[in-house]
Amino acid sequence: MSINVTEIVLHQIHQTEGETPELNTVLRDNLLAISPEVEQMMLQLHQAYQSKAKAYGIFKNESIFAQQLNRLLEQETDFLPFSHSCAKMLSSELAKYPFASGGTFILCRYNFLATDYLFIALIDSRTSMLVDDQLEIKRTEYLDITQYDIACRINLTELKINAQSNRYLTFIKGRVGRKIADFFMDFLSAEEGLNPQLQNQTLLQAVSDYCDQGELSAPQTREVKKQVFEYCKGQINSGEEIALSELSEALPTLNEVDFAQFTQEQEYGLEENIPPVRNALKTLTKYSGSGKGVTISFNADLLGERLIWDELNDTLTIKGLPANLRDQLARNK
C-alpha cells in the first residue's frame, strides 16, 4: 500500500544541560522536499502508529490548536508557520512534565487509502555503530521510527465530514501511562472522545442480553459468543474495526429481531464501527481469574464438561489435569 505525503516538516526540541534544564526549539525555515525516502519514513511511522494502543479525543471549544488547524484547513495560513506554532506550543507544554527530554518534532500531512491525516510526533534519536568505506567503526545516530509513544493523529477527512464526531483525534497512550494522555490532552486542548474499552464491554453485555432474550441454552449461547469472537478476531487481524451491521449479519436472528436492531431498540449507545480491544473480547470464549495465589483460565466450552462448577459450595472441579501441571505436582509431592 502506498502513502501520499503532501506536506512535511521537521523541527528539533533540545533539552539544555544543568541543574534546571530547559527545552529549546530549533525551527526549519522551509518544508522538506517530498522524496521516496520521506514517503518510506512516513509509511513506517503510519504502520507503527496503527499497531499501537490509542485513545480518542475531541477538541474543546477554546482549543487554540483547533483554531490554528482550522485556519490551515481554510487556507488562511501556510503549513510552515502552522508547524512553527505547533512546535512552540508542544515544547512549552512538554516542559511541564518530568519525562520531557526533547527529540525530533515531525508534523506531516498525508493521504492513505483515500483518507487525509495530520500526523504529529516527537521521535527520539538512538546511537549505533557503522563501518565506513575505510572499514573504520564510527558512531552514528538515527531516528527510532518504530519505537515512539509521543504522537497523535487527526483524521482530517473525518473532521471535515462530521465535526461532531468523537473519533477524529487519536493519540498513543504510551508506556509512561496516563501522563502521556494528559500531555496530549493539554497540548491540543482536547478532552476524551470515544472510549473503545467501554464500547467493547457494552458490546459484550449486548451479546449476552441478546442471547438471554432469545432464550438460548448455555451451549447455544456459547456458540453465538464464539461466532462474535471469531468475527472480531478476524477484524483485529486485518486491522479493521468491528462493524455492527456486519456482525449482525453473522449472527442468528432471535425472536424475529436481528442483533443490530436489538442494540438500537435497547439503546446500548454502541457506535456503528467499534475499535476492537483484544483483552476485552477474550472473555467471549474464556473464563479467567486470579486471587489468593491462584490463577485459572480455561475455554468457556469446557465448563460443564471437564470443569464442574458447584456454585453452592464455591468449588470448581477439574477433570483431567493438564499434563505439565500433573508432572509438576508429581515431582513435588
Curated annotation (Swiss-Prot):
Tell me which Pfam families the record gives.
NA37 (PF04245)
GO CC annotations, alphabetized: bacterial nucleoid; cytoplasm
Provide the GO MF annotations for this entry: double-stranded DNA binding; single-stranded RNA binding
Per the record's keyword annotation, is Nucleus included, yes or no?
no
Q: Does the keyword Cytoplasm apply?
A: yes
Coarsely, its chief localization is cytoplasm
- Cite the entry's keywords alphabetically: Cytoplasm
Q: Cellular location of this protein?
A: Cytoplasm, Nucleoid
Entry-linked InterPro entries: Nucleoid_associated_NdpA
UniProt record similarity statement: Belongs to the YejK family.
Official protein name in the record: Nucleoid-associated protein APJL_0454
| The organism of origin for this protein | Actinobacillus pleuropneumoniae serotype 3 (strain JL03)
